[in-house]
Amino acid sequence: HEEWLSGAGQANVSLYNQSGHGPIYPTPVVGMVGLIPDAARAAAVGIGFREEGHAIAMCGTPQPSLAGSELAKLRGVPLPTTLPQADFAAVKRAQDAVRDAVRAGDLASAHDIAEGGFLVAIAECCLAGDIGAKLDFTSGHDAPPSYAELEPYLFGEAVGGFIVSGTREAIER
């Protein structure tokens, strides 16, 4: 049984802001409060990678697009009028999978893919855990993909993706 506290009717999102340096990207934010049945277990799963040899995986459906990303912003690419459409059913499946794996004690770490995309999230996990990561992008390819092919996957900021780590057996579950 999940209970939620609601701030219904209390919303303030401004999609037009300016500063002396130019427009500020729109940033709608949703905050929620809920009950966690086993808060100690949830708190034990941080963003930092924990052990050498753990498997690292992405949970969620990648949407290869740099539209509205930090990388596009750094390159001076104007904010597009449309962004990739989120598949909310897929996002919910990814969130449910991560939640269930945390509850089962299967994950050593979990981190959302947000600002900066997949590669920035990996770097944040490495820094938080004071441990490196070895990544292989050739799996399932006859030849290694080019950087141009990988870039939207590495730096895209599509909603609903997570980096998780744990034992290989736990990750494969």
Identify the function of each model-found stretch.
Residues 1-67:
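Glycine-rich anion-binding loops of enzyme active sites
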Residues 66-85:
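Gly-rich Lys/Arg/Thr-decorated short loops/hinges at beta-loop-alpha junctions or inter-strand turns
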Residues 4-5, 9, 13-31, 80-82, ...:
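Glycine-/charge-enriched secondary-structure boundary and capping motifs
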Residues 46-53, 73-76, 122-128, 173:
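Short, solvent-exposed amphipathic alpha-helical segments in soluble enzyme
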Residues 1, 85-100:
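Structured alpha-helical segments in the cores of large, soluble enzyme domains
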Residues 71-75, 96-99, 147-150:
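Short amphipathic alpha-helical segments, especially helix-boundary/capping motifs
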